[in-house]
Amino acid sequence: MTFSDLLTKLQDNLDIVFNANALKERIQSDPAFAKTIREQLKLLYFLEQKQAKAKTKKKDFQPVFQNLEARFVSLGQTKLANTELNLKLDLTDATDLANYLPIAVCNLFNRDLNSFSKLSSVQPTAVEKTTNGANKPTVTIDLNQPRIHTTGTVSPELENFVNESLEARARQRAFMRVTSERMVGKIFEFQFKSQWIKWAQLAIFISMLLIGAAAIAYLVVVNLLFYRYVNPDSNLTKAVTGQNNTDRPALVDLNGGINLFFPVSASTLITLIFLGFGSTSFLLAFQGKPYSFATRSQTFKAMHFLKHQFGVTDFPRINDNYRYKVRIKWIFWTIFLFVALNALPGGNIITGGILNPSFLLNALRSNELKINSETFKTIFVGFSIFYLASIIPFALISIIAFVLSPKPSSDQTNEVLNRYVQEEMQQPFKTDCDPNNDNDLTPPAVFG
């Protein structure tokens, strides 16, 4: 290969880079990849200058450096300084540097550079379709491998650039491994294991069962109230004259059926459904199991990733990262929805509103709701207050448990991360560019 051939190849490669959306987005978001493209632009300038000075010029030679540099700058990068453009490379080193771009793209995206479409970063190209499923050779680079037509040494600039890229790739893979091992429970991410927190998860589960039991009891009592003990002369059960002398239909239809059941039961039923999901979540967390459909899916993906990328086959059956972490998300939504659905009146007898315990107690206090039996009136008030107060044990236990939860151990995680980086640096730099493999799997880094 001549310098002229190398220039043509590099121009084609950079043309793909600056026209493929996925690669342009990577330049903007990934400093390591942006540095790779920067080195390629320096090489492009070197080759174009060499071609311009050549005695025998290509007939179709068109310099593109200034255009591509401008597009590089438009992606948020800085313009190349004059001192950066003073490359002095022989043909072998220039070829090595040019060949690094397809390797970098392959290892970042697990796709050949030529498979990227210039019009879309999503739709596969014809090249990608025809090679789909093919067993393509592994791309490797070895700085110590003897070279043909050269002294066997690498220029310091090229060696430093490749070493930095190798370290960035090693750190990326190490981070993905640490993230995955945290997800499956092989790495404990907190400072210590608090037995109190573990049992607090069970206590939270029991307190949610208490809320559920109170909700069911209230549901039975409130329906008995309107089916048997409510006074038909209550304003709640008949049309009311509202603003501008407009009549509003009765909030509760005593004729029975759905028109009676759902208005007085809806808020409690919604609460029960949410409690079902929430209590199951805390029970599974207490057992050290994935506590939601999302975490279950993420755990399986992480196990698959570790098995295929690092040969890890031994996974713990109990994930202590679930057992010793109280999640504020479920606590917040449980308290918020309970208060919104049950503790806030949400209206009055004129405008209407959610017929929750608070609304009905206010209606009873203002004599808008009349109960024929004093005994049942006492029962209704007692069960309503008990239901509204049932959120208190849950709130106290869960908030205290969350505040006392152990904090993540950054030192321990960084120690494991650095060890994996060193292991990756000792491995051959290679990848399989088959787009059907699992190399592009990045397990989530945050526990929900």
From Swiss-Prot:
Domain of life of the organism encoding this protein: Bacteria
Compositional bias (Polar residues): 428-440
Region annotated Disordered, chain positions: 428-448
Name of the protein: Uncharacterized protein MG314 homolog
Organism, scientific name: Mycoplasma pneumoniae (strain ATCC 29342 / M129 / Subtype 1) (Mycoplasmoides pneumoniae)
